[in-house]
């Protein structure tokens, strides 16, 4: 706790953020050569006529693209901007700063090169076909900030038709770190994972993925209450899509105020400020809260 107090989150103004993105070169990424480009020979090897040798080799064995190109260490960071974290549907080009940001995180923490690609479409099949058609250039696909349920459709189809890894960050990235935090919090507060009661506010991609991973670790489905804009997702509620129906439970609770009573864990995956002080008081002793 003392260490957490020392590592206070710094806050920045919109002006500072805009200046950061516009300083020196605009944006956050650039492409540089991994080979020397100082002599005429270097240029000839890098382009014509030198490229002919790897081109012919790859044409005979496509897997050699992993040896002679950047494919094996190149990820496509893809979005249509339909569910930008904390901002909603602002369109493809508006999501570009986020995708560039993810690209620099890949480079900074894993030395993985990546290119951001913003697809201006809200048609899942159109997005799937676009990714399919350029996927051969990449070693992996990172999907991000695509609204549910389209993100589920897109990910499922791509995993079926592509021969490279497909990772939906909002689902799996969020679920992995949240589940790790939950396991630690349960250990610290001496709780039994099979007995804890969890309330998840939000029913998008990240919420559903977290719920699924919680269940795989031992949390009973009946102990997880999920809410969307209309309230608690309960069995028998009209208008639920196929994905939300999988998380419906038998409960008399219809609102967050009702569902939070006696809860051990609150996970906020919608907008900030939903969980009020009065609600926290209704939770169990030493509640575990993941919220902004």
Label each region the model flagged.
Residues 76, 116-118, 142, 199-200, ...:
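Structured core elements
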Residues 63-68, 131, 188-189, 213-216, ...:
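A generic local secondary-structure boundary/capping motif
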Residues 135, 193, 259-260, 280-283:
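A short, aliphatic-rich alpha-helical micro-motif
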Residues 56-61, 246-252, 271-274:
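Short gly/ser/thr-rich secondary-structure transition/capping motifs
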Residues 4-166:
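N-terminal ligand-binding/catalytic initiation module
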Residues 142-145, 169, 267-292:
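ADP-ribose/adenylate-binding Rossmann-like module
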Residues 85, 92-110, 162, 168, ...:
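Glycine-rich phosphate/diphosphate-binding loop of Rossmann-like nucleotide-binding domains
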Residues 121-127, 148-151, 171-175, 232, ...:
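Short acidic loop-to-helix transition motifs that present clustered carboxylates
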């Amino acid at each position: 706790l003392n260490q957490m107090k020392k590592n206070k989150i710094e806050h920045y103004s919109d002006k500072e953020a805009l200046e950061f993105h516009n300083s020196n070169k605009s944006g956050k990424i650039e492409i540089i050569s991994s080979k020397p480009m100082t002599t005429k020979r270097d240029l000839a090897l890098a382009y014509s006529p030198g490229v002919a040798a790897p081109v012919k080799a790859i044409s005979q064995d496509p897997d050699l693209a992993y040896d002679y190109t950047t494919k094996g260490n190149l990820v496509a960071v893809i979005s249509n901007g339909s569910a930008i974290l904390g901002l909603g549907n602002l369109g493809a080009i508006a999501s570009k700063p986020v995708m560039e940001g993810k690209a620099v995180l890949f480079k900074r923490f894993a030395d993985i090169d990546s290119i951001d690609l913003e697809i201006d479409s809200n048609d899942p099949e159109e997005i799937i076909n676009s990714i399919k058609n350029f996927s051969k250039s990449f070693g992996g696909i990172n999907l991000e900030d695509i609204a549910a349920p389209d993100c589920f459709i897109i990910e499922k189809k791509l995993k079926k038709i592509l021969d490279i890894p497909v990772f939906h960050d909002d689902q799996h990235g969020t679920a992995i770190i949240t589940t790790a935090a939950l396991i630690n919090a349960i250990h610290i507060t001496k709780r039994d994972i099979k007995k804890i009661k969890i309330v998840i506010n939000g029913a998008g991609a990240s919420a559903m993925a977290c719920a699924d991973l919680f269940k795989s670790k031992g949390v009973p489905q009946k102990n997880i209450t999920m809410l969307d804009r209309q309230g608690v997702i309960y069995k028998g509620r009209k208008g639920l899509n196929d994905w939300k129906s999988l998380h419906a439970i038998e409960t008399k609770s219809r609102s967050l105020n009702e569902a939070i009573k006696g809860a051990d864990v609150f996970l906020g995956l919608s907008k900030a400020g939903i969980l009020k002080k009065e609600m926290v008081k209704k939770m169990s002793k030493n509640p575990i809260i993941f919220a902004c």
